């Protein structure tokens, strides 16, 4: 049964549960407990109190002079003068964060003072036993004894899931290092994680285990994407689907090498898109635009937005076929920022590239992972976004950078957890205020970025946020086409096969792009870009004059289009382009009258046109057409 309309209605509810930081969530509402639940709550509360007492005894001694200098320096950040910038035509004031040069300069001094403190507490920062104690405290604090008891009171299975988690120090540390469970719902996270482990032996070790845990921690609502399917069942389906895609070589080569603490694996599954849409967009990229799967990582996969989802206002989708999903409809006529961001996101998700929404005031955009760091796409820099995954955008970026150093990142967490046990305030305004230890944790993150020389790689396609025209000149790469892909052949029945690369000058231009097919052959894409039509010219030797049925083997993602053939200069023939939904399909035969010997056939599209990919043309003697 088709579920796209139902699923669309729950997108917003899904997004509201996606925060990953254990320190950014509000305290959940109290759950009504049974008598057994109240006993469990008392048990968890005592466990939390004992851990808190143990942690407060672990506080290392800090040189008071160094502590005072650090406190003084980061306190001065509140006095930095803000700057005003024009972002997408609107004035935006920036005070806190690297977007303000004065703030960034002052924060260098704060980091220097923080390093002096960190040098004195190195022994504390590397303690494994202390780390396990603090991680368990952080988990109980984030989950709350009441919510843990509310889950455990449901039955023996739920109680066993909680016991498994709370008795496994290694799992607790891993869980909290990767950001904890969304919304503090550790019971649901364990239910999903256990289901994935039961469904796949490989999910017990290596990056497969990290990925299984990360996905379970991220999506902790009762359902995931499909509103009538329990979350654990849905996540198992996604995991097995992606596992098969990984085995089949469909996922990106970097998928198993994302590394770091594993935090980025939280974002490889889509936040709201069905498996049907995921599989369809894989087909689009692999069949229709395989060149987009080989680009450098800023534009890899999401380039499909730039090539095939034009920025168009006022699109009426009411008359579009009801059996198409929203994603499929966006390809028909384009759309404004939201549809473009949605297509960009799912194009990354489908191939295992961590992706997120990156909204800014009045604009929808996206952000995704690259081997060099996260970048915003088709929108402004992180500075100017409203939130990323429920976190302040610059804190999300810093988190993603610091997670690249698992050892250093755990030290940052130890400082935070100690401060939490001591009742300190959380850092605010990008490290401008907060308690001593928790702020030190923030600056330990910054030290990682500086020590590892991690760069902010900035925006991608910001100039295309609300435009189809880039101010940056695009370099058109030429491809070498082996002769075997240019050879015209004649079958025993007289059918002539003309590879699309057998044209007179197989050269890439604004509209025409020759590329390697996913199966190792060659294909051409005739795209949206360019002001004037471009031609493909073919010379074909016909052994016997007569009428031939012409077909083209095509792949399309739009409908109601034609292309034009010009035969031997005189004859013009329209050919209907089928809507193939990203499959490969032959056009309906059209009759061409050809002479014996050399014939010239020109191919072009009417303007304005939509994209079409072609592998070959065929000419079949009319008597053989069925």
Residue ranges and their predicted role:
Residues 107, 141-149, 155-330:
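Secondary-structure boundary elements
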Residues 2-12:
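Bacterial N-terminal signal peptides that target proteins for export
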Residues 395-506:
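Long, compositionally biased intrinsically disordered regions
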Residues 321-328, 333, 338-425:
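Hydrophobic/aromatic-rich core segments of domains that either
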Residues 24-28:
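Boundary at the C-terminal end of the N-terminal hydrophobic targeting segment
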Residues 11-21:
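Bacterial N-terminal signal peptides
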Residues 469-626:
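Extracytoplasmic
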Residues 29-210:
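Non-catalytic protein-protein interaction scaffold segments in large eukaryotic complex-forming proteins
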């Amino acid at each position: 049964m088709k579920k796209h309309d139902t699923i669309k209605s729950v997108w917003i509810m899904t997004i509201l549960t996606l925060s990953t930081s254990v320190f950014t969530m509000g305290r959940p509402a109290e759950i009504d407990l049974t008598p057994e639940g109240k006993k469990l709550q008392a048990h968890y509360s005592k466990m939390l109190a004992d851990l808190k007492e143990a942690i407060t005894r672990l506080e290392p001694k800090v040189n008071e002079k160094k502590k005072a200098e650090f406190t003084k320096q980061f306190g001065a950040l509140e006095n930095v003068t803000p700057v005003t910038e024009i972002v997408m035509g609107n004035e935006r004031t920036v005070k806190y964060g690297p977007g303000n040069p004065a703030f960034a300069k002052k924060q260098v001094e704060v980091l220097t003072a923080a390093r002096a403190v960190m040098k004195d507490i190195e022994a504390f920062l590397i303690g494994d036993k202390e780390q396990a104690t603090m991680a368990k405290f952080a988990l109980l604090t984030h989950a709350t004894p009441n919510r843990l008891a509310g889950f455990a009171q449901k039955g023996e299975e739920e109680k066993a899931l909680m016991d498994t988690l709370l008795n496994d120090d290694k799992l607790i540390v891993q869980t909290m290092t990767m950001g904890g469970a969304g919304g503090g719902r550790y019971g649901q996270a364990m239910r999903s994680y256990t289901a994935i482990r039961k469904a796949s032996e490989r999910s017990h070790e290596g990056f497969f285990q990290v990925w299984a845990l990360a996905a379970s921690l991220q999506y902790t609502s009762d359902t995931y994407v499909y509103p009538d399917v329990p979350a654990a069942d849905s996540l198992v389906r996604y995991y097995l689907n992606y596992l098969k895609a990984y085995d089949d070589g469909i996922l990106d080569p970097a998928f198993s090498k994302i590394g770091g603490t594993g935090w980025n694996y939280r974002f490889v599954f889509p936040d709201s898109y069905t498996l049907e849409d995921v599989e369809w967009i894989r087909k689009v990229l692999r069949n229709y635009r395989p060149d987009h799967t080989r680009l450098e990582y800023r534009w890899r996969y999401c380039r499909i937005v730039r090539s095939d989802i034009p920025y168009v206002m006022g699109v009426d989708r009411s008359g579009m076929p009801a059996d198409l999903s929203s994603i499929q409809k966006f390809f028909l006529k384009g759309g404004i920022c939201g549809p473009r961001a949605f297509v960009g996101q799912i194009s990354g998700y489908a191939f295992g590239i961590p992706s997120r929404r990156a909204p800014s005031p009045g604009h929808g955009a996206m952000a995704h992972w690259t081997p060099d760091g996260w970048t915003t796409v088709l929108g402004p820099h992180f500075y100017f976004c409203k939130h990323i995954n429920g976190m302040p955008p610059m804190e999300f970026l810093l988190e993603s950078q610091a997670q690249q150093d698992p050892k250093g990142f755990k030290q940052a967490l130890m400082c935070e957890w100690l401060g939490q046990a001591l009742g300190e305030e959380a850092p605010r305004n990008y490290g401008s205020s907060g308690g001593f230890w928790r702020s030190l944790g923030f600056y330990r993150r910054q030290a990682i970025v500086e020590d590892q020389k991690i760069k902010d790689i900035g925006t991608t396609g910001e100039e295309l946020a609300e435009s189809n025209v880039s101010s940056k000149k695009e370099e058109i790469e030429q491809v070498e086409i082996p002769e075997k892909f240019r050879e015209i052949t004649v079958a025993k029945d007289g059918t002539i096969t003309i590879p699309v690369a057998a044209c007179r000058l197989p050269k890439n231009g604004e509209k025409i792009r020759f590329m390697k097919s996913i199966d190792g052959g060659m294909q051409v894409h005739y795209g949206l870009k360019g002001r004037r039509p471009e031609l493909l010219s073919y010379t074909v030797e016909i052994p016997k004059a007569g009428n031939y049925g012409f077909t083209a083997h095509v792949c399309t993602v739009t409908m109601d289009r034609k292309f034009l053939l010009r035969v031997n200069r005189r004859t013009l023939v329209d050919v209907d382009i089928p809507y193939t939904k990203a499959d490969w399909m032959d056009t309906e035969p059209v009759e061409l009258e050809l002479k014996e010997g050399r014939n010239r056939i020109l191919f072009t599209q009417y303007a304005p046109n939509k994209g079409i990919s072609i592998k070959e043309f065929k000419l079949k003697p009319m008597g053989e057409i069925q």
